[in-house]
Amino acid sequence: MSTSRGLGTDFDRWLGKLFRKGPFTALIVLVKITEPKVEPLRSTFVHVVGNKIDWGDIVLMLRGAGVNWDGAAFFPTRDGDGGLVPDELARGRLRELETALREDRLVLNKGAFFDVWGRNLKVEEA
């Protein structure tokens, strides 16, 4: 059951705008924020085939990661035809993203980065 339906979080607005172009695959990175550090915890990908999901649904899904997280970054990606990315390609893109994040946490700003309440976040240089 959704917990934020109708609240209109930054995430909900982002998803609605992005989905107007059709289904996509989202690379997701969960992070722990302990000022001044941002540490990646877990990553995954999901295929977004509809916009009936909201931030509350996402939070419920991300509970399955088994970690307490402070932020979630979403990196939408599409195949060459503008649709869903095959699983194997999504896994490869996720590994590339993980490598880039190990080198530079500011990469999080290239995605859509949200706190636990679905509000926009941004990583600042220390």
Place the predicted regions along the sequence by residue.
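Short, solvent-exposed beta-alpha or beta-beta edge segments that form flexible loop/patches at the rim
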Residues: T9, V46-A65
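The transition from N-terminal targeting/processing segments to the mature protein
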Residues: L27, P36-V48, G71, R102-R105, ...
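Amphipathic alpha-helical interface surfaces
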Residues: N51-I58, W69, A90-R93, L97
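Short, flexible beta-strand-to-coil junctions
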Residues: V29-P36, F75-G80, V116-W117
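Helix-rich interaction surfaces within compact, conserved domain-sized segments
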Residues: M61, P86-A126
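Short, low-complexity cationic-aromatic patches
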Residues: G16-F24, L60-W69
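Mid-chain, well-packed structural core segment of small domains
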Residues: R63-G92
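N-terminal, charge-rich interaction modules
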Residues: M1-S43
